[in-house]
């Protein structure tokens, strides 16, 4: 059977369910899928949630994360939806960016209100730059007192506000269980609540800026010389687009240099332009083989700058995940793998933190021995002797 062609007719948006472990994230994911299947059967497959694809995912950094992926469409948009069933999986996914979210549905049980993990998830969403959160107040069928539901709603709005999210976001009162089971009391009412939730997601979560519209950036993977023509750098374009005869900067490791791209090739075919996702060779005017190296980036002039000192948020692998067997302390000197290269860095733990244990989710300062083209949100792996021992992202550039 031929694979269906991916129709790019509707805007594509990545969302996810976040929140405390027993508050009904996975049930809500199932309910959304079922309600949309019934409303738009042509574009939404019927999922068997016992078989939902929750295969472990190897993040690029060599960490196993259990993520369930489903896709569905509303009238306006095509969604990819991630649900991380386990709390540790959620933390790892957020920090590694294995499944990035353009917005999130925070699921809070009206029976419990916000719990410790609810708070941790909201904080993490803020730290990793999830732009918008809206709320599904779940299990409303189990609370008779409307005032109690309103108190919980107020508490959730306060929590969002404290973490820099919009306290006036949509909050939908729902029962995922009631919408999922045809024989549940008030079934139609709860089905409507899921439709209301998705209408709110359509309107409230912004369509992401496509990678093509961002400034051009290509990490250099390899450098070689073509006799009589000059130096070619190869790599996969991370974002943006680039036309022939455009000036670019080479950033990182050494002082920044400016040059012009005189030819663009992919798999030995010349192109007028390349864009995000292309595997490309760029011919650079006036630079020798020894002037550029793996680990630098080719970028639109002025769009990215080299830095050596940053604050990072890191998930430290456990022994079972192939990580360290023992804690580390300030002045630990592992390698930090950014895009295509390792750079040694010195870790300084925050005041009052004596050590970091395998399995911890930690924030600390790093000073690299060489500058790297860096911006907030950039992900990296922490490696020791070629093995990944942690995975993180830059939360703040310091120098």
From Swiss-Prot:
It comes from the Bacteria. GTP binds at residues 19-26, 83-87, 138-141. Residues 175-177 are annotated as: G5. Residues 83-86 are annotated as: G3. It catalyses: GTP + H2O = GDP + phosphate + H(+). Residues 10-209 form the tr-type G domain. Pfam families: GTP_EFTU, GTP_EFTU_D2, GTP_EFTU_D3. Residues 62-66 are annotated as: G2. Belongs to the TRAFAC class translation factor GTPase superfamily. Classic translation factor GTPase family. EF-Tu/EF-1A subfamily. HAMAP family: EF_Tu_B (MF_00118_B). This is Elongation factor Tu. It comes from Bifidobacterium longum subsp. infantis (strain ATCC 15697 / DSM 20088 / JCM 1222 / NCTC 11817 / S12). The gene is tuf.
């Amino acid at each position: 059977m031929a694979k269906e062609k991916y129709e790019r007719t509707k805007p594509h948006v990545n969302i996810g369910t976040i929140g405390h472990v027993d508050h009904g994230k996975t049930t809500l994911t199932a309910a959304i899928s079922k309600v949309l299947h019934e409303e738009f059967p042509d574009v939404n497959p019927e999922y068997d949630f016992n078989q939902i694809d929750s295969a472990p995912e190897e993040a690029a950094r060599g960490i196993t994360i259990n993520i369930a992926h489903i896709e569905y469409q509303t009238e306006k948009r095509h969604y990819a939806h991630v649900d991380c069933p386990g709390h540790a999986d959620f933390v790892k996914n957020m920090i590694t960016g294995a499944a990035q979210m353009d917005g999130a549905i925070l699921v809070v049980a009206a029976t419990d209100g916000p719990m410790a993990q609810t708070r941790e998830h909201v904080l993490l969403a803020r730290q990793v730059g999830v732009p918008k959160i809206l709320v599904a107040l779940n299990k409303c069928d189990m609370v008779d007192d409307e005032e109690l539901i309103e108190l919980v709603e107020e508490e959730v709005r306060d929590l969002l506000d404290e973490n820099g999210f919009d306290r006036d976001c949509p909050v939908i009162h729902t029962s995922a269980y009631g919408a999922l089971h045809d024989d549940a009391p008030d079934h139609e009412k709860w089905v409507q609540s899921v439709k209301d939730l998705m209408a709110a997601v359509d309107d409230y979560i912004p369509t992401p800026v496509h990678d093509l519209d961002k400034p051009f950036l290509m990490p250099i993977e390899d450098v070689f010389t073509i006799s009589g023509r000059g130096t070619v750098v190869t790599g996969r374009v991370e974002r943006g687009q680039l036309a022939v005869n455009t000036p670019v900067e080479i950033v990182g490791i050494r002082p920044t240099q400016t040059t012009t791209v005189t030819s663009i090739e992919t798999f030995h075919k010349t192109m007028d332009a390349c864009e995000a996702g292309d595997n490309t060779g760029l011919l650079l005017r006036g630079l020798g083989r020894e002037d550029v190296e793996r680990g630098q980036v080719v970028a639109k002039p002025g769009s990215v700058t080299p830095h050596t000192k940053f604050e990072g948020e890191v998930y430290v692998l456990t022994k079972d995940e192939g990580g360290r067997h023992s804690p580390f302390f300030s002045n630990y000197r592992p390698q930090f793998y950014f895009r295509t290269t390792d750079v040694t860095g010195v870790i300084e733990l925050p005041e009052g933190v004596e050590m970091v244990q395998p399995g911890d989710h930690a924030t600390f300062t790093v000073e690299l021995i060489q500058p790297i083209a860096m911006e907030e949100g950039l992900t990296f792996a922490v490696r020791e002797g070629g093995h990944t021992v942690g995975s993180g992202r830059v939360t703040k550039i310091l120098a």
